[in-house]
Amino acid sequence: MDSDTVTADISLSSFVYALLLLPFLLILKHIFLKPPPLPPGPYPWPIIGNLLQLGKNPHVKLASLAKLHGPLMSLRLGTQLMVVASSPAAALEVLKTHDRTLSGRYVSSSLSVKDPKLNHLSLAFAKECTNNWKNLRTICRTEMFSGKAMESHVELRERKVMELVEFLATKEGEVVKVMDLVFTTICNILSNTFFSMDLCDFEREGLKDFIYRAAELGATPNLSDFYPILDGLNLHGSKKKSKEALGRILATWEGTLKERRKQKNPGSSHRDLLEAFLEIRFEDDQINQVILELFSAGADTSTLTIEWAITQLIRNPDVMYKLRDELTKIIGESPVRESHLPHLPYLQACVKETLRLHPPAPLLLPHRAMETCQVMGYTIPKDSQVFVNIWAMGRDPKVWDDPLSFTPERFLDSKLEFKGNDFEYIPFGAGRRICPGMALGARQVPLVLATLVHLFDWSLPDNMDSAQIDMEEWLVITLRKENPLRLVPKVRK
Ligand code: HEM
């Protein structure tokens, strides 16, 4: 046998051995290199998964499910996978350690922008954190939320709040839907920052009702969110309804946009966001998209926080008394100014305590896994929806003493801030997707709240006692429409 034949025999036998070993190697790979499992969660039913388990207050139900399944759990909603983080440690993993991968946005099919050009120019609904999204955040920060921009709008915010006070004063003794009026004020603060004009009226319906309607449609789950294959069928007709509602919102500033495009020099006494957008040659569609998103993200969140703060103050007269006392000592008889806010620690603590118990976005906005990743020893597959249940974290007895009581004092000697670094307390989120409007929210909410508490006495109508305002989360919104929470403001003499 010559050496060539021996070499050929050896290679042939190595090949045969390798072939025989292959199944074993594959089995070993399967056993040892198997990706970690999905996060634990309730058993999913065939086809519907866990859809029926969420109910009408998903954050409340998810909080109780997390007690059974742990701080990182997964549920199936139709064909979609939902992952929920419910502890500060899990929130830190999602919003800091894996922020790059998990900062995609999951957008409901009824809200999703079909035009790819607009999708690239979206802020809250941008599916990825693209350069366009970064640029948009930078423009909004520079023009609206930076220290300089915030200072340039102080007088505007104070004026709008005084208009609310003047209107309320004309209603002495009457039953008033105060929170509708607060919503009007917040919308007008925003619309003046965008266009230097009011878009809402205390007496008439208009923009605010269209925004309610659009928000309601956006929050209503759509079957194609759970079964994307049904997307083209538009079973609820919700896309048509959202399009109508959005069309009516856009119509409220269409004329202004046209006018301002024609003007060479806008002539407004202070710069607004529209001026910045026109300078960088944004088209109408692009401007509409961003302003729409800023309205939807900024108006309801601030109003709900004020509404809950007032509700908690009525429920807790001692806290109301202490807050009034602080306001009287620091402000005296004059109207509240933004320059007073840094000197009102108890007011700031009341706002923080309200955001702990009643975060207006209890699950943040839905994030999306842009790639498959491993978190806390579990796999989160690409395109899963990822939520952080800050409502559950705000009421967790492992994190807070006596978590259900409204005790602003807990924030007085504490260094806890809502700026996205303390993961037990993130009402504005954290990481790349943190709320860009935090600076504005953190000024307009205490300004309006302090004004309402300082200038008015709050009492309930005779036929309602404080037990009746023992509301469940999100019921406030329902109350507003079906059985509005009517508080009687009495102007203090
Ligand atoms: C009390 C007031 C507010 C609270 C509690 C709040 C809270 C939040 C939260 C929790 C998020 C989602 C963060 C995430 O998904 O991780 C968010 C996003 C957002 N907020 Fe706010 N917000 C408030 C006021 C405002 C205001 C006044 C504006 C602007 C006018 C605003 C504009 C936005 C936008 C555009 C986003 C989407 C950001 C993105 O996806 O990149 N918010 N906010």
Could you describe each region identified by the protein language model?
Residues 145-149, 173, 187, 219-224, ...:
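Conserved cytochrome P450 catalytic core segment spanning the I/J/K helices
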